[in-house]
Amino acid sequence: MYEYKFDREKCWFKDVCGKYKTTDCCASCLRFMEFDFLIYTSRIPKVYQKSVNLKPDSCDYNSFEYLNDLKQDIINFVAAGENLFIHSCFTGNGKTTWATKFLLRYFSEIWLGNGFKPRGLFLSTQNLLFSIKQSFNSANNVQDLLDLIPVVDLVVW
């Protein structure tokens, strides 16, 4: 269950907000509230809840530029119902980081006027399939998660 807790030091926008460290930076900040709710309902792991700077290798530069352009135009990408499959045989080369960058960018574009609705999901396919399997033998909240998939705008698998 979602519980709102304001912490200005954990604000996603403190580096760009003119109200940070002023008396206007307080628990009633709608931007913080909405973004906090979007992050919570998306299930993005804590380690990915803040955007990380990536530096492309020369062999990945074209892919990096493509993904960066897509991130900059995430609203139109989502509105068009597009899909993207980021894959590699290797670990640690930024696939998950890029996926969460898309979610974070999307959330930063749509928070105003969102009305505290879930708008994106970060799903570990392995964990989802395991939860579905477990649901056959016990009660768990996998159905709540499955019900969200067709409702939100953006799903990262």
Where are these regions (language model features)?
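Phosphate-binding P-loop
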Residues: 72-82
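Conserved nucleotide-sensing/catalytic segment adjacent to the nucleotide-binding pocket
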Residues: 130-157
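A short, basic N-terminal segment
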Residues: 1-72
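Residue-level preference for the first positions of well-ordered beta-strands
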Residues: 81-85, 119-120, 154
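Walker A/P-loop nucleotide-binding motif
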Residues: 80-100
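Post-Walker A helix-loop "phosphate-sensing" segment adjacent to the P-loop in P-loop NTPases
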Residues: 103-120
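A short hydrophobic beta-strand->loop->alpha-helix junction that borders the nucleotide-binding pocket
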Residues: 117-133
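Conserved catalytic network of the ASCE P-loop NTPase/AAA+ motor domain
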Residues: 77-78, 113-115, 147-150
